[in-house]
Amino acid sequence: MFLKNILSVLAFALLIDAAPVKRSPGFVTLDFNVKRSLVDPDDPTVEAKRSPLFLEFTPSEFPVDETGRDGDVDKRGPVAVTLHNEAITYTADITVGSDNQKLNVIVDTGSSDLWIPDSNVICIPKWRGDKGDFCKSAGSYSPASSRTSQNLNTRFDIKYGDGSYAKGKLYKDTVGIGGVSVRDQLFANVWSTSARKGILGIGFQSGEATEFDYDNLPISLRNQGIIGKAAYSLYLNSAEASTGQIIFGGIDKAKYSGSLVDLPITSEKKLTVGLRSVNVRGRNVDANTNVLLDSGTTISYFTRSIVRNILYAIGAQMKFDSAGNKVYVADCKTSGTIDFQFGNNLKISVPVSEFLFQTYYTSGKPFPKCEVRIRESEDNILGDNFLRSAYVVYNLDDKKISMAPVKYTSESDIVAIN
């Protein structure tokens, strides 16, 4: 999850709940299922929390049919267009404690701490639709009911890029994931949060929000002999798919084309690699920068110069929504790819359509202009709309990330990472 203030968008989220897991020697596999629910989990703006967002177009800014009309709109006046955006979160079922208390948590490569809501947590409403005990609807933790619970009497405090936060105390207890049990796992038991569910951060130890480094889940899985390396692979599948997969300690060789290409991680705290250039429909943009590969971020973020070149290449135009936020739109039929060139001659090609999202007339009919799902930021982040086109292996031990073009298939050929 992007740990920096960013402009986010009103969202229909795709909540991905962990399906039954398969356990194999040397690795732990979790399969994810996709379902839609109306939330706006990445929206820090007050206006977006209160009402839907709109764009206004004049008739000259969109095509009309032979009669001079396009369903609901007259050529003589402007038209309001509703913004509906999707966010994707990847969640897994875990158990905590000797009594196997069940919780569902977001799996996040952009952070490093596991935290879960206490059974008496105070849920602080932040987004539209947050009511009652919304923050523990996916489960909560009762230390008193677990014989193996240990209160470390150390405070925990974390804040995410969308403005959500979690506060509590550090505990140790048994954590079950993917059919295995991790003993004495350190995590935060949270008594106050504005987030909708707990988060399982699986990044570097140095990225932990605590004042000291500890063994987070990937490290514990390795140290307790469950996996051979503190590493995991991520397969998000296609945008239309209903399943995805993360494998701790393993790689599915059936899920990518060609060979995996190793890239050194360029940060001590974040899972970043070097990006050399971006080619947009034949227009090359020098990047020479580091990018974070973040499963907890739905869209992608770049510095201003990269964003402007991408927008120009796809013919985007700037608009302002009803809350005053800057929005870029482009023809929904824009074809071609955006090619990301990394070191060691690795190229990942992403369809332009991955960076476009449908807008709608207020009647619900699709509008011919789509929102461009790229944002300006001081940091460069490749989110889910990039990661769906790549098979990514995060190796925390060897400080490298390996990637290859994704292959969408139901076939499987899993090997352990040694």
UniProtKB/Swiss-Prot annotation:
Propeptide section residues: 19-76
Keyword Secreted in annotation: yes
Binding site residues for Zn(2+): E268
Regulation: Inhibited by pepstatin A analogs.
Intracellular or extracellular location(s): Secreted
GO terms for MF: aspartic-type endopeptidase activity; metal ion binding
Name the record gives this protein: Secreted aspartic protease 5
Gene: SAP5
